[in-house]
Amino acid sequence: MFNRSNEVDEPIRVEGKTMGTTYHITYFDKKGRNFKNSIDSLLIVVNKSINNYDPTSEVSRFNTNTTGIKFDLPYLYAPLKKAQEVFHASDGAFDPTVMPLVNAWGFGPGKQIQPDSSKIDSILSFVGYDKVRITTDSLVKKDSRVQLDFGGIGQGYGADVVADWLRSKGITDLLVELGGEGIAIGKNLKNNVPWQVGILDPNSTYENQFFKAYVSLTNKSFTTSGNYFNYREIDGKKYSHTIDPETGFPAQHAILSASVFAADCVTADVWATAFMVMGHEKAIELLKQHPELDALLMFSSTDGKMQTYMTRGIEPFVKLEP
């Protein structure tokens, strides 16, 4: 006799746009609830805290204010504290105060020109996450010129907020992907296997995207930072969008991409950015000191061939394409 209780319901898929990118969410719910409207409403509020491209957001108000801001929403304090933690742990490689440098190099909304070194030196005098003070209800500038770029933290934090909200609704098996990063909880019940996430090949172009690796994940967050499509060409030379806050110039390393796996997505997000800034050699050394992190790094060897490095914790779950 056919037993209906052994069947698994079809997953519910929700997708949309947020933070200048797209999101895709898959989850299983015996009640068959579609949470798209609630998720969109939640992301609108999160954007009102952390979206640099919304001139009315809290982070934008901080950037245009000379002294700082009081928090109106509950979504800015947590990523600010995480940024502070990784700023110190990475020796300043992750630093959200690079915003004026991002704009100077034309990665913001302005014109693409190469700034001269004197302008860079001038901007560097007010770059540094130690130039802000975070309290439970406010963010204060120690220098009126300080500005924050949440590009290396916002999407990961947004994915965490959505995943936490879904879990609060009793969802135990879900995959949240926001702008290529996200969190995998439980299993893909349709096939009773871990969730599978693809990692882009660094040779991908915007028009032709293909995967270099597939990773099987359960109860783990993931993010990949790379300069796949995001670079500027000035006078025939390509510059990566990853700014080194120590030099003020785009980071020049052999690293092609950094995929990081952690307990939460905001942690994975900030460390992936930090690894792109510091390069694969320093990243490998730092990973030895941080057993809570796993990573898959792709980089160019001296002969121009692509190499990979994986931490032991993630290696059994990675399938590399030839």
Where are these regions (language model features)?
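Mature catalytic core of soluble alpha/beta enzymes
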Residues: 1-322
